Amino acid sequence: MRKNKDLWVDWLTKYETETQNMRLGENYSLAESLFETLNDISAETRGAREIRPTDRSITGLLKVAPDQPQIPFESSLERDFAILMTGRRGVFSIEAQPVTIRYLDDLGKERTYTPDFLITRYRHELEQPESGLHTMLVEIKYTSDLNGKNQPTLLQKFKHAKQWAEFKGWSFSVFTEKEIRTSELERTRELLPYRFLESETPIERAVYLFVRRHKVTTIRKIADALHNFSAEQVHTEVLKMLATHQLF
């Protein structure tokens, strides 16, 4: 008899989640040396805090960019997932509770299931040969919920969601706190406020050309090289460019 915690390991949606996270997470590798200086330069922007169990049931609206609609969420984990996706290069849109799927359970009774998110992203960012967009239905669940008393019901819901998604040419994945609450999330959370700043075009171009020439560098080195601008201006512009994927 397999233990509960092992049931999900080989399940396709979990496997897809882990491999997709690993592949998409590589987008941060080149930017890492730039971002490591953030704690020293702008520690006051840190908004991360420890998530307590009582935060599970919070609801609200998340604004991730000035030109995009707010994203509704019904738990802190859903909010964190939306933030995580915001930081991933190639993500085109994040839609909450996009569709309700109807299906028959084992007893022939009609049931409904509404996944938490629909993520659309460019295929080339996933290193896939096909051009165009890739669409993924997503369910957000705590690991304890996956392995709890409702596990059989969840498995049935997810099975039908996966079949429905494949019929549409989409995919379906389950994300837990293990995939969401990572160092990647903390970096994205800290960069989020910079997405709302106006760009300083001369600084932006100078930063872009410097990074393009030197490939891997640090914010401090960029600021030292671009002596026509103040260090504060350069720091802010670099962080904004990281937040909006203009660098790496």
Predicted features and spans:
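Electrostatic, structured charged patches in enzyme active sites and in nucleic-acid/phosphate-binding
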Residues: 1-248
